[in-house]
Each structure stands twice: as C-alpha cells, then as structure tokens.
Amino acid sequence: MCDDDVAALVIDNGSGMVKAGFAGDDAPRAVFPSIVGRPRHQGVMVGMGQKDSYVGDEAQSKRGILTLKYPIEHGIVTNWDDMEKIWHHTFYNELRVAPEEHPVLLTEAPLNPKANREKMTQIMFETFNSPAMYVAIQAVLSLYASGRTTGIVFDSGDGVSHTVPIYEGYALPHAILRLDLAGRDLTDYLMKILTERGYSFTTTAEREIVRDIKEKLCYVALDFEQEMQTAASSSSLEKSYELPDGQVITIGNERFRAPEALFQPAFLGMESAGIHETCYNSIMKCDVDIRKDLYANTVLSGGSTMFPGIADRMQKEITALAPPTMKIKIIAPPERKYSVWIGGSILASLSTFQQMWISKQEYDESGPSIVHRKCF
C-alpha cells in the first residue's frame, strides 16, 4: 500500500491543525492550520489576483488583512462550506492528488453527532467522488499508534479534550468524558495573564503570536505552589521572547500558570474537573474488572499534551486519586502531536482493514447512513 498511486489518504481534521498524508507513511506530509480567511477590506489594487478566501498557511501569513475563521469548533465541524474548502485545499494544493483515485480515512471527535458523520460521508462521495472512505475515532487511532488495543487515551488538541477508555479496540461510549478546555483556551488565558504584565495582545493575528510563546516556553509544574514561590523569589524561571517587530518581552510564572489551567480549570472560570480528575472519573465509569488495565495504560495524545512535565504531573495526580496499590503508567510518546494521524496511517495500511472501507457502490445503495453500520 505504500505505493502513492493507490495509497489511501489519511486526513486528521483537528480544531487547530489539519494533518494529512498517505497511509503507510510514518508522518503526515501536510500539516497546516484549519483556518479559512476572508479579506477584511475591499481590494483596491486591480489585477493583484486577490482571492475571496484563503486556506491554511496562506491565510496565516496574510492574517493581518484577513478575518480568520475556524470551521471546526471543539473538535466538531460547525461550518461545512469552509470545511469543504479545507478538504479541497488538502487534496489539490497540499497532497496534490485526485480525490477520486484514493480511498480516504477521515477522523472524528468522540461523541461526534450522527448527522455530522453522515455529512462528512456525503461530501466525500458526492463532492469529491471518493472511491471509498472510512471515519475513525481520533482517540482510538492514538491508542493504535502506541501499539495497544486497551487503555485510556487523554486526547487534547486545540479545541477540545476527551478521555476515552478503550477495551480490545472498542471505545466505551458510556465512559467517554469531554472537556471543553484545550489549547485555544490556554492561549487565550496566556493572552490574558500577559496583559496583566502590561503586554497587550488582542487581535486574532496577535493570538497566533501568543500561541507560539505558549508552544515554545510553557511547561507544567510538578508542584504548582512550590513553583510559584520559586518564581517569586528569583528570576531563574524567566525567559525572553522576541516579538515579530523586534520588541523583546520577558515571561516568568506565566510559563507554568497557563498550562496549570488544565489541572485547575477554575483559573479560566470553569467549574469542570481538571484533566487528572476527568481521567479518573472516566476510569471509574468503566467496569471494575478493566480498571487495572486502564490505569496501567494511560496514553497522552494531541498537541496540548506536549508541555514538558505533563506526564510526571499526571502520574502524581492520578496516583493520589487511585487506590494505593494500583500500578499507574502514563505513556507520552514523543510523536504524540501526530499520533492520531499515525494511527490512521497504520490502520489504513493493514490488509485486514481493506474490507472495512465504505465503497462508492455501498454508499449509492444505502446513502449516508451506511457510515453508522460500517464505522464504529
């Protein structure tokens, strides 16, 4: 299957980034922001070839003159016209393939509304004429990528986080918990606490700068109170960051205060449980006989689990909640930013998977609802 001519395409549509490539590859070929930008002002320069919309990196680089919109909010597609633009861009500009020649594996958020899966299926077959397609749950793919079939995945991206217990390859829907707290919220919170320090970030374009600060400088403290004291008494934790205009800003306790919101959502004014408690609650909703396997196989996945120190902190917090003799293992693969995509690449290239595709013929016979029968 690693021959590009017939290779399946794997597209992981996240709230923040699209990861796309060919099944059998070990990393996605195209990773670009899930954004569609439209000009804020009427173009005055005739013949400049100004477009009415820009997608991905191009939208990002022209962000100063555009209004940026994310068609995927909290992991779920909310704007199908823009989503179609993103898929079109993925096939024709990024991967440079004809979608009618390749089977395509798409990913979806856990607990995705049924109508959404049907709409995805319909667009693939009717707009892009795909020969075959499949929709897989993101967290399940992350678990495959870690070489397991049983475990609990904490998947946290830009728009949403989920804890998904999986047993022998099947997600347990009654125990899946969703947390509307993820990378974008942490970026917004970092914008807010940097404003308190006297730096002003307000526009959608400036938010991207703060996201970069977050990705480069933030980390999770093992002991938050202790770290706050260290930060107050010395400048050892301070780092500087150069803004695009050359101004240099200094960032101190904000480095760990922003990601701390994952463990203490009250920082964001949210009443929900932190990620450690959410994981624990999710495990407790499972059958008592499989909990041991879940504790011992807690897999982190997604870009918002990339903070240094997050695995150790998670280990510490879950150990405090779990029964005293329980063996707890947090698995944080270095490539976890792309583990959903990697899992999709593995799945779509398995010989045993080939019978699982929904073919164009099956779609024509049954319509969009076929997706519920074949993808679970």
UniProtKB/Swiss-Prot annotation:
Record PROSITE patterns: ACTINS_1, ACTINS_2, ACTINS_ACT_LIKE
Subcellular location: Cytoplasm; Cytoplasm, Cytoskeleton
Propeptide span(s): 1-2
Keywords recorded for this protein, A-Z: Acetylation, ATP-binding, Cytoplasm, Cytoskeleton, Hydrolase, Nucleotide-binding
Catalytic activity, reaction form: ATP + H2O = ADP + phosphate + H(+)
Transmembrane segments: none
KW Acetylation (keyword) present: yes
InterPro entries, A to Z: Actin, Actin/actin-like_CS, Actin_CS, ATPase_NBD
Listed GO CC annotations: cytoplasm; cytoskeleton
GO molecular function, one term: hydrolase activity
Keyword Protease set for record: no
EC number of this enzyme: 3.6.4.-
SMART domains (UniProt xref): ACTIN
Residues recorded as bearing N-acetylaspartate in the entry: D3
Gene3D superfamilies documented for this protein: 3.30.420.40, Actin, Chain A, domain 4 (3.90.640.10)
Family as reported in the entry's similarity comment: Belongs to the actin family.
Matching PANTHER family: ACTIN
Reported function: Actins are highly conserved proteins that are involved in various types of cell motility and are ubiquitously expressed in all eukaryotic cells.
Protein name as annotated: Actin, cytoskeletal 2B
Record gene name: CYIIB
